[in-house]
Amino acid sequence: MELNNLKPAAGAKHAKRRVGRGIGSGLGKTAGRGHKGQKSRSGGFHKVGFEGGQMPLQRRLPKRGFTSLTKEFVGEVRLGDLEKLPVDEIDLLALKQAGLVGELTKSAKIIATGELKRKIVVKGLGATKGARAAIEAAGGSFAE
């Protein structure tokens, strides 16, 4: 056994370093905070985003956009999703039961993403021009 080969026992843990507890520890007196200044004082930190009195970036940039309040009540369904539904008559209730739109949805619109190869009847749903054309090309129809 030699001094340079000493190891702590298995499962041993180092004690947490205690600052400000004497010069011999290497972290006494100023406790690693340096001399004077805001950061050396207790409670000496500014809030996040504070830039020393300069107008903060968040306030320098213009506001933009808004959050739509109707977003959660309007659903969007792809043609490819309608292809997978087991029913031929599609309305809002069928979409809710299939989990394609949320329970709070009051209206839905079909968009032309994906392919539709079978005949379906759409009741009470909106559709984009492309989606309407694709449904009618597959032999489907719209009933209001």
UniProtKB/Swiss-Prot annotation:
It comes from the Bacteria. InterPro entries: Ribosomal_uL15, Ribosomal_uL15/eL18, Ribosomal_uL15/eL18_sf, Ribosomal_uL15_bac-type, Ribosomal_uL15_CS. Keywords: Ribonucleoprotein, Ribosomal protein, RNA-binding, rRNA-binding. Residues 1-56 are annotated as: Disordered. GO terms for molecular function: rRNA binding; structural constituent of ribosome. PROSITE patterns: RIBOSOMAL_L15. One of its GO terms (cellular component) is cytosolic large ribosomal subunit. Residues 21-31 have a biased composition (Gly residues). One of its GO terms (biological process) is translation. Part of the 50S ribosomal subunit. Belongs to the universal ribosomal protein uL15 family. Binds to the 23S rRNA. PANTHER family: 50S RIBOSOMAL PROTEIN L15, LARGE RIBOSOMAL SUBUNIT PROTEIN UL15M. This is Large ribosomal subunit protein uL15. It comes from Burkholderia vietnamiensis (strain G4 / LMG 22486). The gene is rplO.
